[in-house]
Each structure stands twice: as structure tokens, then as C-alpha cells.
Amino acid sequence: MQMQQIRYFLALCEERNFTRAARRCGVSQPSLTNAMIALERELGGALFQRRPEIVLTVLGHAVHPYLQRIAENADHARAAAQTLANVRPANREAAPLEQDARHSLGRSG
């Protein structure tokens, strides 16, 4: 599973249209469609009912919150890394990763 596929899935959930979701993601519609086919193959079933309109299947509804969380956690990790990149090199010492440290990076659970 690739982050790109997750982002496309989430855009398609919001747009409910392959062309608009592809435009939003800055890719061609066939590229988005192929990514969704690959994700469906990996997850073992259809994520969307494609006719007459785009709606989530039972599997799509089941995986949506997990994929949303993955995308959010990736955003938190990216923000934490960017913040650390702005810290002076002398302050970038290795530290043990403890539960409190994980929570400060935006991880819940």
C-alpha cells in the first residue's frame, strides 16, 4: 500500500467522481483509476460502487477510518520532521522513543 493510493482514495471519497479527484490530486484520471484498482486488489475487494454514482462499498467504509488515520499520521510525522529540520544541528541528539515522545508527535493510542 502506498501513500499515494491512500491520498487518491481519500480524495475520491470526498469528490465522488474520478475526474474531479484526479484533478484535485494533480494526476490523470487513468492514473487515479489504476491506483484504485491496485489498492482494491491489495485489500481484496471493491472499495467503490462505480455505477450509477460513486459510493463506498462495505469494504470501503470499513477501511476509510484506518486510511484517514494513516494520512493524518503521515502529515503529523512530516510536520514533526520539518520542525526538527529547523532545529540547530547541536540540538538534534538521539533520544529514546518513549510513549510520551510518541504522543508529542501527534500519535494517539
Name each region found by the language model.
Residues 40-56:
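A short LG(V/I)-centered, amphipathic sequence patch enriched
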Residues 42-43, 63-87:
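Alpha-helical linker/hinge and terminal dimerization helices associated
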Residues 82-109:
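Interdomain hinge and pocket-entrance segments immediately C-terminal to HTH DNA-binding domains
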Residues 1-31, 35, 63-68:
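N-terminal short secondary-structure element
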Residues 34, 55, 100:
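Short alpha-helical
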